[in-house]
Amino acid sequence: MATWANLGLQNSSSPLMEQLNFFHDHTLLILIMITVMIAYIMFMLFFNKFTNRYLLHGQTIEIIWTILPAIILMFIAFPSLRLLYLMDEINSPLITLKVIGHQWYWSYEYSNFLNLEFDSYMIPTNELDLNGFRLLDVDNRIILPMNNQIRILVTATDVLHSWTVPSLGVKIDATPGRLNQTNFLINQPGLFFGQCSEICGANHSFMPIVVESIPMNYFIKWISSQMN
C-alpha cells in the first residue's frame, strides 16, 4: 500500500516484515546482477568482429547455461521457502483476534475475553477530524499489545475479502465458510493502516484497517474499560 512520497516498501514494524524486506532486497540484487551480465554479453556480441563459421554445438557452454540458472534459482527458492514456513508457524499466541469481513466493513472479536467485539467502519470524509486520515481512519480501531505474539483468525460472511496490513507483513484471505489464520508480533507502538486487498464490490476501496499498538499495561487498562 503506497503512502505519500513513498517509492519503496513501508517501514517494517514486525520481525516477519523485516524478513520479507530482506528477501525483497536479496532477490532484487540477484535480478540486477543477471540483468547487468546479460546486457554486457549482448553489448559485446553486437560490437565485436569475431565470427566462428564452423561452430555447430558447444557442449561446455550448454552445460554452463543449464546448471547456472538452477543454482541461481536455489539462491532464491531456499530463503523463500524459509519465509513461507515462518508465516505458517504459530508461536504460543497471547491474544487471539477473530476478523470477519462484510460488505463493506470489518467485525472484530477478542476470543480471549467474553463479549468483547465490535464493528469497524470507515469514517466518512465529511465527519473526519482535522488531523484524521482520509479514507483510512475508522470509528473503532483494533487495540493490540506490542512485543507479544498475536494470532489472527480470518473469515467472511458474504464474498471474498483480504485482511492486509503491509507494515506488519500480513495479508490473509477472508473466505466465507473457511477460517484462515496467521500470527505476527508488533515490535513498536503506533498506528498501522491497511485495507481490504480483494475486490469485493462497489465499496471495496472503503474498508480500511487500523491497528493501534500499545504497551501491555495500557492494553490491560483498555480491556478493563471495555469489559466495564
Curated annotation (Swiss-Prot):
SUPFAM superfamilies in UniProt: Cupredoxins (SSF49503), Cytochrome c oxidase subunit II-like, transmembrane region (SSF81464)
Binding site for Mg(2+): 198
Catalytic activity: 4 Fe(II)-[cytochrome c] + O2 + 8 H(+)(in) = 4 Fe(III)-[cytochrome c] + 2 H2O + 4 H(+)(out)
Domain of life the protein comes from: Eukaryota
Transmembrane segments: 27-48, 63-82
EC class name: translocase
Topological type in the membrane: Multi-pass membrane protein
Subunit and interaction comment: Component of the cytochrome c oxidase (complex IV, CIV), a multisubunit enzyme composed of a catalytic core of 3 subunits and several supernumerary subunits. The complex exists as a monomer or a dimer and forms supercomplexes (SCs) in the inner mitochondrial membrane with ubiquinol-cytochrome c oxidoreductase (cytochrome b-c1 complex, complex III, CIII).
Protein name, entry field: Cytochrome c oxidase subunit 2
Taxonomic placement: Eukaryota, Metazoa, Ecdysozoa, Arthropoda, Hexapoda
Gene behind the chain: COII
